Amino acid sequence: MDVTWTVKYITEFVGTALLIIMGNGAVANVELKGTKAHAQSWMIIGWGYGLGVMLPAVAFGNITSQINPAFTLGLAASGLFPWAHVAQYIIAQVLGAMFGQLLIVMVYRPYYLKTQNPNAILGTFSTIDNVDDNSEKTRLGATINGFLNEFLGSFVLFFGAVAATNIFFGSQSITWMTNYLKGQGADVSSSDVMNQIWVQASGASASKMIAHLFLGFLVMGLVVALGGPTGPGLNPARDFGPRLVHSLLPKSVLGEAKGSSKWWYAWVPVLAPILASLAAVALFKMIYL
């Protein structure tokens, strides 16, 4: 199937919006006062984010389903995605995250108005390390703990994501085919070869489905295992876009308990996943490609 880059940008927007609807929607259901699942199991949030990654991947994986600026940058830095489309992808992802968050606010507004905890309200938008107790003396500890947590979780996510989408077709075979085509004068990259295999190879649909299921359960596992300190981050668009929405919406929408958007912490869930992605994709490429 031939897909234009414009369609890919739109798909990244839609996919990221779905991620936020499923993921932050689950957080809102648990954190906001008066909801059906208020103060219930953290597993609800794990399932929300797992499905939030899995469903766009299953629905749009044959077009594009990166839905994460850190992953896009990691792939581009390792030569697995064209730099010419990185900015457009990231813009689409951030806007998609903002749109998805606005839909969550629309649905949950009565419960935002009931909630008296400003951190609970912010937590339905973006992440914050639990070391923070709203005093300046805890900011350094929250920043360090948050950065370590985000880096570790993101590294595992991105290494697993690249592995899941490459190993099924044999990374050595992809490298051999790329080199062969270049030797024949073709201007191709490993990502070009891999994309064509995903579309054309016999049994590709089954392999892609397995990979997408794996990614969903991987995210769910990471949220359950490492979400305790910061909440589910692992994605700059997932944090920055909704945090921006939080800062822009007035108290008439989010309630009188709306507090600070905590921009002092905002660089952590942006930079840590990006650095983790660069390291994870580079390591995978060094070992397997």
From Swiss-Prot:
- List where the motif NPA 2 lies: 235-237
Q: Where are the transmembrane segments?
A: 10-30, 41-61, 87-107, 151-171, 209-229, 264-284
Major place of localization? membrane
Role of this protein: Mixed channel protein that transports both water and glycerol.
Q: What is a single cellular component term in the Gene Ontology annotation? A: plasma membrane
- Motif (NPA 1) positions are 68-70
PANTHER family given for it?
AQUAPORIN OR AQUAGLYCEROPORIN RELATED (PTHR43829), AQUAPORIN-9 (PTHR43829:SF9)
Q: What is known of its domains?
A: Aquaporins contain two tandem repeats each containing three membrane-spanning domains and a pore-forming loop with the signature motif Asn-Pro-Ala (NPA).
Q: Which organism is it from?
A: Lactococcus lactis subsp. cremoris
Bilayer disposition of the protein: Multi-pass membrane protein
Q: Which family does it belong to?
A: Belongs to the MIP/aquaporin (TC 1.A.8) family.
Q: What is this protein called?
A: Glycerol facilitator-aquaporin gla
Return one GO MF term. glycerol channel activity
Q: What is a single Pfam family found in this protein's UniProt entry?
A: MIP
Please provide the Gene Ontology terms (biological process) for this protein: glycerol metabolic process
Which keywords has UniProt assigned to this entry? Answer: Cell membrane, Glycerol metabolism, Membrane, Repeat, Transmembrane, Transmembrane helix, Transport
> What does the UniProt entry say about where the protein is found?
Cell membrane
